[in-house]
Amino acid sequence: MRGSVYYQTGQLTEAIFVEGAKKEDRIDPDHLHYKCMASYKSMKTYRDVWNNLGNYLKEHWKLKDFEKINEEHIDAYISYKIEYYPSKQYLEKIVSALGKLEDALKRFALIQYGAERDYDFSIRQNKLHYAKVQKLVANGYHNRVYQNPVQIIENLSNDHHKVAALIQLYGGARSEGVTLIKKDQLKGIAIDPITKEEVGIIETKEKGGKIGDVMIRPYVYEWLEEYFQYDERFKINYQAYADDIRQTCLRLGIEPHGTHGFRWTFAQNRVRIYQDHGYTYEQALQGVSWEMKHFRASITEHYLGG
């Protein structure tokens, strides 16, 4: 499918929206209107989500064709939304909209090509369930910054988890940037352009193929260098890592914010570092956004409660 994001979601809306379609027909597998939508309000709500998804995929995955969306893209998009600690209702709306997108793509293919294409976005329900169980959704805005992150890290039960958390805390990496690190990702010691202090550089490739440098404390970098003398890969299990953080927080009487809490803490601390070195608030937001592999400065503001 070609055209702008808005044009493509319009085409999909035409495929799935039937004004006046009866409810009994929309739930009848043998009816022409099966799984169609008839509410203008709901259709607009879902299309807004589709537009947001399309812009996300265009920015992060360089994907411009809705017909090429697959399960991996849906997984990444929901993970991206969970980063910002959404409300339960908002995440449920996104998941419902993505389910209807699957239906719309199938109907569009049937109309255009005479046969349905195989789309399966069922992972969205698993992501929603996981987010609820792990308390990654909120009833409103909730700051996920750790007040004493070092205490948490020092008390983690696994040394590899400690290293991963330190990289997230001091480098702002996403979880997928620390669960697997290869030897050739180490790029040496450099100078932090803001503080003018020495830092270790790790090149990470995160969801969507975004490649960029993560700056970490020299002692963490040296630990990795020594580790790679004996192993080609530093690898941890994400679920075990997240569980270790959660159990450690509960044991210490600290509210757990998951692995991403370290990334939130990095954002807040890094903005302050920029300002301490003479940068304006707006310059700090943009600089930190780039370091966190975002383009828009406004995204960093979310981590600060803005």
Indicate where each model-derived feature is located:
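Active-site/catalytic core of tyrosine-dependent DNA strand-transfer enzymes
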Residues: 215-271
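Conserved tyrosine-mediated DNA breakage-rejoining catalytic core shared by Y-recombinases
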Residues: 180-220
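DNA breakage-rejoining catalytic core of tyrosine-based enzymes
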Residues: 127-150, 208-219
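C-terminal catalytic core of tyrosine-transesterase DNA break-rejoin enzymes
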Residues: 265-298, 302
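N-terminal DNA-binding module of tyrosine recombinases/phage integrases
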Residues: 1-40
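A short, glycine-centered helix-capping/turn motif at helix boundaries
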Residues: 167-180, 273-274, 292-294
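Basic, Lys/Arg- and aromatic-enriched nucleic-acid-binding interface segment
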Residues: 144-175, 282
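N-terminal core-binding DNA-recognition domain of tyrosine recombinases/integrases
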Residues: 26-131
